[in-house]
Amino acid sequence: MSEKVNDTIALFISKLSEATGYQYLKSRRSLKKTIGQIVFEVLFFSSKWNDDNHIGINADFRVSYKKYGAASTAYSVVASKSFRNNTEYWYDISNKSKFDEILQYFETELQTTAVDLFDRFDKDFKAACQYLLEEKFKEYNVFFDFLVDVLGEETVMYRINEFIEQLSESDKQKIADYKKGAKDKTWMLNRSNTHFVADNGYL
């Protein structure tokens, strides 16, 4: 990757660091803040096709619970949101006008996601989890195990029931196969809400 590409991406992330108050970790190309065992990260990705004429960037927002393992691993992520540029995956920051436009977009997005959620957890941990359950469950792909751990099964049960109701007959058959030892689907091997439902006898 050329020096221009690296410098442009570094400038983009550093400006977002200033706008959000998140720490810029250059080695990970990420923004990070921590409250106790909760780690908030915005991870940036760049296209392998980037060159001086086209610089594409994208980002994911992740919330990790260090009680479950190191941050940003399959074991510890409890909520996440990917940013999508309509039909295109990459956001183009190749020239000044595009750079400024996409910077403004991400400043707005991160204020309503990463900054807002950090502030909520900083103010009231349990209330922030309740907010994830009630307002942002689908948008942030929130994990059941975390919500049950913090809020209790009774509080989270309506979301679990909603999840089960939306399963297709094929999904239910795969859960039955998993209980008999099948390991041919990604969710059977990794932590997921389907895995949680199957392992805890909800179906």
Predicted features and spans:
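Long, charged, glycine-rich C-terminal linkers/tails
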Residues: 25-31
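Amphipathic alpha-helical segments
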Residues: 2-25
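Intrinsically disordered, low-complexity regulatory regions enriched in serine/threonine/proline
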Residues: 1-6, 32-203
